[in-house]
């Protein structure tokens, strides 16, 4: 007897100025979750557009532009808010805490929690292996990574190592539409990368048409994102770090991005 893999429906939209709102929906159980809650009104509009109701919020980290809609959405829909244990006191309305290695179910889908600190001390990513998708908050961006507000370069490097270990065909959904500016920086670090140059041109076309640049994929990020290319000989040579540890190469790239 053949089994049919479950299908996850994903509704992605830009809200606030550059935040991504992301709703995930399991049609068989009719459950819907919001990845973070940047803007309650925008999320409500997306739910109405799709004819869904909201059951969960999966919080990646405590920053206001990711949790500001929590209380309004909880009041309207009675949602259960899940978020990182390490940031429990900073997440409005939180009902359930999770930590690295935890696993829970969302309808027919397994959700694996990956601790990805660096941007904040307790940030987590949510990986749905059956849907081949990972939701990385402000840890991994398209062609970038999050600023280190509460972590060190080594902390973020170790978090990114966890994400690049996922299958290459895993779709990547992140918290912000920063891709065009990230591409400009990436080209200063890896100017000979033909895949990056092609991607940067495509990103420019998409943004000129006011279209979204996500989702990406783990494979695409590994091929073009300088923050994941600490091993590349050309990048190392350009930075003067030919023999440096991988984490030192990453730290130098992050330092340069902070000054870009």
Swiss-Prot record:
Residues where Zn(2+) 1 binds: 61, 63, 119, 138
Entry binding sites for Zn(2+) 2: 65-66, 138, 176
Pfam families: HAGH_C (PF16123), Lactamase_B (PF00753)
Biological process annotations from GO: methylglyoxal catabolic process to D-lactate via S-lactoyl-glutathione
Gene Ontology molecular function, alphabetical: hydroxyacylglutathione hydrolase activity; metal ion binding
Cofactor(s) recorded in Swiss-Prot or TrEMBL: Zn(2+)
Keyword Magnesium: no
CDD domains: hydroxyacylglutathione_hydrolase_MBL-fold
Pathway the protein takes part in: Secondary metabolite metabolism; methylglyoxal degradation; (R)-lactate from methylglyoxal: step 2/2
EC number(s) given by UniProt: 3.1.2.6
Top-level division of the source organism's lineage: Bacteria
Record field: catalytic activity: an S-(2-hydroxyacyl)glutathione + H2O = a 2-hydroxy carboxylate + glutathione + H(+)
Keywords, sorted A to Z: Hydrolase, Metal-binding, Zinc
Cofactor annotation comment: Binds 2 Zn(2+) ions per subunit.
Subunit note: Monomer.
NCBIfam families: GSH_gloB
Similarity comment text for this entry: Belongs to the metallo-beta-lactamase superfamily. Glyoxalase II family.
Function: Thiolesterase that catalyzes the hydrolysis of S-D-lactoyl-glutathione to form glutathione and D-lactic acid.
Protein name, per record: Hydroxyacylglutathione hydrolase
Organism: Brucella anthropi (strain ATCC 49188 / DSM 6882 / CCUG 24695 / JCM 21032 / LMG 3331 / NBRC 15819 / NCTC 12168 / Alc 37)
Phylogenetic placement of the source organism: Bacteria, Pseudomonadati, Pseudomonadota, Alphaproteobacteria, Hyphomicrobiales
